[in-house]
């Protein structure tokens, strides 16, 4: 077991430099760790599983996977389940949290493995390696990148210089080698098709000084062909999609669909891969590593050569020999290779045969090749070019990362593609699985055997457990005597080298000698090997040809004759025509590199990461139990746990055991402090004894304490948690009282702050309004009310209400514009032959412009449209008078329409909004006159006149504004009034006959007013107002029976009280029926078509005061029709004590604009009562409506308005066919017929057409909202 880091240690490097650390004092336990540490799902270390079965392992991994915990330990082995998504667990904060921490202190993570490897290197002065294994798509490459990320972050202490350069180059190898060595397969979008062993070299200070990469098993056959729905190496798609115009011109590049090698499989794009951006990342990695521009051009020239070689197509001639269908393609390929085109065609079509007699050189013949042979030679050349190019890139990277100073230690990271089982398994799968068998052998020897050796070393009594040793499978593949599979392949290749089919048959015959091996089965033209991961059936066809791995001498002569020096660098070996030595086969190379890898790994201290793929669909939520059980079996996880649990499930050094559990013994702890004075071993024994653990459940080793069953450890952890709860209960009694008092005080403070915070924003805006006016303008009394708030969007444009949506669409306001202010206004409109007149408008201000929207009746239909749009940048100044009127002029740049003059009751708020949006870069002119542009070249002046006879809003006539006196210009707003105290509700009595009204309170007349004021409209969510129906006459006897209390035995029932006298007859009431739906604003009454309301007052300006459900409000008179009342019936019997309320009808649920609870928020045309009922402006009720505002009546005529027809919905535009991609100009080279990818076009999503602006059907909109409200109520 690795030595644990000491608590309080600041860094691994410091500990390494200081030599052996002294025994450290046990730190005081921290009670808060149980509250701050996240509770893990399942068990984080599977050695603590109660049941050791594959199913139990799978259940634990599944629970943790579903809880987004993908890492689990088996002792020091990390199990990683690929999450197929970003869990946010690789950030710098997470990385730093593992820095300098022991494995047991933190939850399982790949950073913990990296920290352990780096720490052991610096403290034990030994080389380390991290072996990552698992099947394709299980996350090995990602784990390797995270290991390098951690080591690069924690190693070294100096910034800049060579150390940082080495770190950058090490990290830059990831995108570079992924581009050239990874490809999309059926199981993985970024599958490593080669093995990579990265060795990071460190100096004595623990700082990286260099690195070296060793490449294994590049799958070069993928260059010339792939199965369906797979791709070639990423670099080909990056190159063809992301190359610059200069590259395309130099190399004759087209899209990936133009090349047979990379388009034949029908997969050109991958959703999870952006080839263009990845190509830019590859170029940056080349620059970081130090590749010159000439070297980069040479690399891309070889890639282009491979692509054009694949487009050389062979056809069968009349004589049965192969011929090139388009010599122009061969000419361009020869141009890229810098060889003679005729020589290239000859090498591809002819083969040189040489006869020998008795060791003497004989005759030389040129033998024509058929189509299959020519294609094989072309593919062999392409594969050799790519393989040697990849080897050159690796060697070039090693040159750049070569250490400049001596290195002392190494941390190796092995990332090699995992065990593979396909439907058709060939030589590539045999090689891959062989290497994985070797890695499994290392795991068995170094992990399972080391586990048993630890028990022996610690002198622990235990029973050994047998485990599967896969060395017999490795011998089956690699042994020479008796001949293994590789040796048999070599013999078959040597005896029938001229005919691949004959060589395959020879191998089948020779492999029959392997049938005696229990792990081998011959099955005709196939054979089966029983690997540790499962049985794999291999196909013999083509296996001997792949094992040859040599180019014919004709192709080597062709390359030797090239004028490209880079090509000579890729093929440094000269052709020896006299050599009779058999070149090494692919099997020989694989066996040699695998044994060298094993030798390197055996010289290091290993760390293991076993990766698991949860499903085959790369889904972040799917968990395939069957597939994972198979991986658990062949990874040997159960055997690993059994060996770890053979004697004892948990072990820890004495110091760590004491640090964790010393609280459980009164002899070792007092008040949380460690008080034991003896040695650590005796301290552990005392803790376990006082915890009442049986002696057979634990043993003491030489340096560690061992616990047999995981239940014992769980018990100790539970007792440790219970200790803190017991101690906490003693403190809680005294603490609760303090906390209660503190909480009550905090609640009071919070309540006060919340109340102030809500009004603070509006008070700041209001104060800014005072600054804008600067004491120059008389103020309206209602503008100075303390409850006056600058709400802004009074028409609810941004709130999504029906009216807001209608106005937004009519004004054509884009969704990107933010509405800051909206209100009703009256625009001064000049008409031919008549004086100017105020006309109602909707005023909207966004962050870009000011909008004036008008509603008009045209052909019996209400039409709302945009009248004028004024960009904020065109407003030069704002002009107002110095009296209390509401007139405002926007002085804009010269235009035909001139400057708009309008009135707005929220003028101060409107000006503050405009100044805020424009940054205050405009002047506000306040004076006795308003100077404005009536037209483009025509100026005009509006004068003011103070007239005390004008009681309501200002009047306008002949360029003169008449208005009464207002509050002094230097007036300030009143403070916010305190909230009313809550009224305690009286207890209900059984004899109460007063009906309960859950609606708004009844209106009460203000001082000086003759009529009660209408209550302000409720803001926030729309509510359904209950409707109270007239009580139905019920016989008195029935009433008494219904309300009689239950009888009490032995007591006579008291007679019921006499009914109250009937109320005196009042004046006759007039009821009217609503003809249309109407949604009103503040002080107005909502109407639903068909309902009846009582008319309380009729005004000449077209608005009537109506009563509905005990509430009053204004409604348009031409929306109502009188209901003829029947003759009054005879007086009914006494009414019951409680009226019966009928079910309320559906009310409109259209949300209204936020209401303001003071007079300044009420438009002038709503304040009728103040102008007609009292001579003082101070007594004007907030919801009254002046008689001088007849122009604000929405229906302009008294006649019954016709119901507009619903406008037709514009037809949905037809979805056109997807246009064919534009094909660039054909390069000046001919192209051979190519294999096009499979058609996989999908119709794109078509956005729904936007709503047509302009006229909207208000009646239909209100009816639709009323129906929706009815559905919600039902």
Swiss-Prot record:
Gene3D superfamilies: 1.10.10.820, 1.20.5.4820, 1.20.58.530, Kinesin motor domain (3.40.850.10), Myosin VI head, motor domain, U50 subdomain (1.20.120.720), SH3 Domains (2.30.30.40). PROSITE patterns: MYOSIN_MOTOR, SH3, TH1. It holds the Pfam family Myosin_head. Keywords: Actin-binding, ATP-binding, Cytoplasm, Cytoskeleton, Hydrolase, Motor protein, Myosin, Nucleotide-binding, Phosphoprotein, Repeat, SH3 domain. Residues 957-974 have a biased composition (Polar residues). One of its GO terms (cellular component) is plasma membrane. Residues 41-721 form the Myosin motor domain. Residues 725-745, 746-771 form the IQ domain. One of its GO terms (molecular function) is ATP binding. GO terms for biological process: actin cortical patch assembly; actin cortical patch localization; actin filament organization; endocytosis; mitotic cytokinesis. InterPro entries: Kinesin_motor_dom_sf, Myosin_head_motor_dom-like, Myosin_TH1, MYSc_Myo1, P-loop_NTPase, SH3-like_dom_sf, SH3_domain. SMART domains: MYSc, SH3. ATP binds at residues 134-141. Residues 1054-1067, 1126-1138 have a biased composition (Pro residues). It is found in: Cytoplasm, Cytoskeleton, Actin patch. Residues 1067-1125 form the SH3 domain. The modification Phosphoserine is found at residue 363. Phosphorylation of the TEDS site (Ser-363) is required for the polarization of the actin cytoskeleton. Phosphorylation probably activates the myosin-I ATPase activity. The keyword Nucleotide-binding applies. Its main location: cytoplasm. Type-I myosin implicated in the organization of the actin cytoskeleton. Required for proper actin cytoskeleton polarization. At the cell cortex, assembles in patch-like structures together with proteins from the actin-polymerizing machinery and promotes actin assembly. Functions as actin nucleation-promoting factor (NPF) for the Arp2/3 complex. Belongs to the TRAFAC class myosin-kinesin ATPase superfamily. Myosin family. The myosin motor domain displays actin-stimulated ATPase activity and generates a mechanochemical force. This is Myosin-1. The gene is MYO1.
């Amino acid at each position: 077991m690795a030595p644990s880091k000491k608590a309080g240690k600041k860094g691994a490097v410091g500990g390494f430099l200081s030599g052996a650390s002294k025994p450290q004092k046990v730190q005081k336990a921290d009670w808060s760790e149980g509250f701050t540490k996240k509770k893990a799902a399942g068990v984080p270390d599977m050695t603590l599983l109660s049941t050791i079965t594959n199913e139990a392992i799978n259940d634990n991994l599944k629970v943790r996977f579903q809880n987004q915990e993908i890492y689990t330990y088996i002792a020091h082995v990390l199990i990683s389940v690929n999450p197929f998504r970003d869990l946010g667990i690789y950030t710098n904060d997470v990385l730093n949290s593992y820095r300098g921490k022991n494995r047991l202190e933190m939850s399982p993570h790949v950073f913990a493995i990296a920290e352990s490897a780096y720490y052991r290197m610096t403290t034990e002065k030994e080389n380390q390696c991290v072996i990552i294994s698992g099947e394709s798509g299980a996350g090995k490459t990602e784990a390797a990148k995270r290991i390098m990320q951690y080591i690069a972050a924690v190693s070294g202490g100096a910034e800049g210089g060579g150390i940082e350069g080495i770190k950058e180059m090490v990290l830059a190898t990831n995108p570079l080698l992924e581009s050239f060595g990874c490809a999309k397969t059926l199981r993985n979008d970024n599958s490593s098709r080669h093995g990579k062993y990265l060795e990071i070299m460190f100096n004595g200070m623990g700082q990286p000084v260099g690195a070296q990469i060793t490449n294994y098993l590049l799958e070069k056959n993928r260059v010339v062909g792939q199965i369906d729905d797979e791709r070639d190496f990423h670099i080909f798609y990056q190159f063809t999609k992301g190359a610059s115009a200069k590259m395309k011109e130099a190399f004759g590049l087209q899209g990936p669909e133009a090349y047979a090698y990379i388009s034949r499989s029908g997969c050109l794009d991958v959703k999870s891969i952006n080839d263009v951006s990845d190509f830019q990342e590859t170029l940056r990695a080349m620059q970081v590593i130090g590749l010159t521009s000439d070297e980069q051009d040479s690399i891309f020239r070889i890639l282009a050569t491979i692509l054009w070689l694949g487009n050389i197509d062979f056809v069968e001639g009349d004589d049965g020999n192969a011929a090139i269908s388009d010599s122009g393609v061969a000419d361009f390929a020869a141009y890229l290779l810098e060889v003679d085109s005729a020589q290239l065609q000859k090498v591809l079509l002819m083969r040189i045969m040489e006869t020998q007699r008795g060791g003497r050189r004989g005759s030389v013949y040129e033998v024509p090749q058929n189509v299959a042979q020519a294609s094989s030679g072309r593919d062999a050349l392409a594969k050799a070019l790519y393989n040697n190019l990849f080897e050159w890139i690796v060697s070039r990277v090693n040159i750049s990362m070569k250490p400049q100073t001596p290195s002392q230690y190494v941390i190796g990271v092995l990332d090699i593609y995992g065990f593979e089982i396909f439907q058709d398994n060939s030589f590539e799968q045999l090689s891959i699985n062989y290497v994985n068998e070797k890695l499994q052998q290392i795991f068995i020897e170094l992990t399972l055997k080391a586990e048993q050796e630890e028990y022996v070393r610690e002198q622990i009594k235990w029973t050994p457990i047998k485990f599967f040793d896969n060395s017999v499978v490795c011998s089956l593949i690699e042994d020479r005597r008796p001949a293994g599979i590789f040796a048999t392949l070599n013999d078959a290749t040597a005896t029938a080298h001229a005919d691949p089919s004959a060589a395959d048959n020879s191998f089948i015959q020779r492999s029959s000698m392997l049938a005696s091996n229990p792990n081998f089965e011959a099955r005709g033209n196939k054979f089966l090997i029983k690997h540790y991961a499962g049985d794999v059936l291999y196909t013999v066809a083509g296996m001997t040809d792949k094992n040859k791995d040599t180019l014919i001498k004709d192709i080597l002569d062709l390359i030797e004759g090239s004028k490209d020096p880079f090509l000579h660098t890729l093929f440094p070996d000269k052709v020896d025509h006299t050599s009779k030595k058999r070149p090494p086969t692919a099997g020989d190379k694989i066996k040699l590199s695998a044994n060298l890898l094993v030798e390197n790994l055996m010289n290091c201290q290993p760390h293991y990461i076993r990766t698991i793929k949860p499903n085959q669909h790369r889904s972040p939520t799917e968990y395939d139990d069957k597939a994972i059980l198979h991986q658990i079996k062949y990874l040997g996880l159960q055997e690993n746990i059994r060996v770890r649990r053979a004697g004892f499930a948990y072990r820890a050094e004495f110091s760590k055991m004491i640090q964790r559990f010393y609280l459980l013994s009164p002899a070792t702890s007092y008040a949380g402090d460690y008080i034991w004075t003896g040695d650590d071993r005796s301290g552990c024994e005392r803790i376990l004894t006082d915890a009442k653990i049986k002696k057979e459940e634990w043993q003491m080793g030489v340096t560690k304490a061992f616990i047999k069953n995981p239940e014992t450890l769980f018990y100790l952890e539970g007792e440790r948690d219970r200790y803190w709860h017991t101690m906490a209960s003693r403190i809680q009694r005294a603490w609760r009282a303090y906390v209660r008092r503190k909480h009550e005080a905090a609640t009071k403070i919070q309540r006060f702050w919340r109340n102030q915070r809500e009004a603070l924003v509006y008070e700041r805006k209001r104060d800014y309004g005072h600054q804008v006016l600067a004491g120059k303008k008389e103020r309206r009394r209602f503008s100075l009310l303390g409850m006056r708030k600058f709400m802004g969007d009074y028409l609810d444009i941004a709130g999504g209400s029906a009216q807001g949506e209608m106005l937004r669409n009519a004004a054509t306001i884009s969704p990107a514009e933010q509405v800051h202010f909206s209100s009703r206004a009256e625009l001064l409109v000049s008409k031919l032959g008549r004086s100017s007149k105020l006309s109602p408008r909707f005023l909207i201000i966004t962050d870009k412009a000011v909008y004036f929207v008008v509603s008009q009746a045209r052909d019996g239909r209400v039409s709302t449209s945009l009248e004028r749009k004024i960009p904020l940048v065109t407003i030069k100044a704002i002009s107002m008078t110095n009296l209390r009127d509401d007139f405002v002029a926007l002085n804009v740049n010269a235009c035909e329409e001139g400057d708009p003059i309008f009135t707005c009751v929220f003028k101060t708020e409107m000006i503050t909004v405009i100044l805020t949006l424009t940054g205050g870069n405009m002047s506000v002119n306040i004076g006795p006159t308003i100077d404005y542009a009536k037209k483009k070249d025509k100026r005009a002046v509006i004068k003011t006149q103070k007239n005390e006879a004008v009681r309501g809003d200002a009047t306008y006539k002949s360029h003169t504004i008449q208005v009464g006196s207002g509050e002094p210009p230097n007036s300030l707003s009143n403070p916010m009034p305190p909230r009313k105290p809550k009224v305690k509700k009286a207890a209900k009595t059984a004899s109460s006959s007063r009906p309960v009204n859950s609606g708004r309170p009844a209106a009460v007349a203000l001082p000086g007013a003759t009529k009660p004021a209408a209550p302000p409209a409720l803001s926030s969510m729309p509510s359904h107002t209950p409707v109270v129906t007239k009580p139905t006459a019920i016989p008195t006897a029935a009433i008494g029976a219904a309300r009689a209390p239950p009888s009490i035995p032995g007591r006579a029932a008291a007679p019921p009280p006499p009914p109250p006298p009937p109320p005196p007859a009042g004046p006759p009431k007039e009821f009217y029926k609503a003809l249309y739906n109407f949604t009103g604003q503040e002080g107005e009454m909502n109407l639903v078509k068909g309902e009846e309301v009582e008319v309380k007052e009729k005004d000449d300006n077209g608005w009537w005061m109506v009563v509905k459900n005990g509430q009053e409000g204004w409604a348009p008179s031409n929306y109502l029709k009188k209901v003829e009342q029947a003759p009054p019936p005879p007086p009914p019997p006494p009414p019951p004590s409680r009226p019966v309320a009928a079910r309320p009808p559906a009310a409109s649920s259209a949300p209204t604009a936020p209401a303001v609870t003071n007079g300044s928020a009420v438009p002038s045309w709503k304040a009728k009562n103040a102008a007609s009922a009292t001579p003082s402006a101070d007594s004007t009720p907030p919801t009254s409506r002046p008689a001088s505002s007849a122009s604000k009546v929405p229906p302009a005529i008294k006649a019954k308005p016709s119901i507009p027809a619903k406008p037709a919905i514009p037809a949905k535009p037809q979805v056109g066919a997807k246009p064919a991609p534009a094909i660039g100009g054909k390069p000046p080279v001919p192209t051979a017929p190519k294999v096009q990818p499979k058609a996989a076009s999908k119709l794109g999503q078509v956005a729904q057409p936007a709503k047509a602006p302009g006229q909207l059907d208000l009646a239909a909109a209100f009816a639709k909202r009323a129906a929706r409200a009815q559905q919600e109520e039902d």
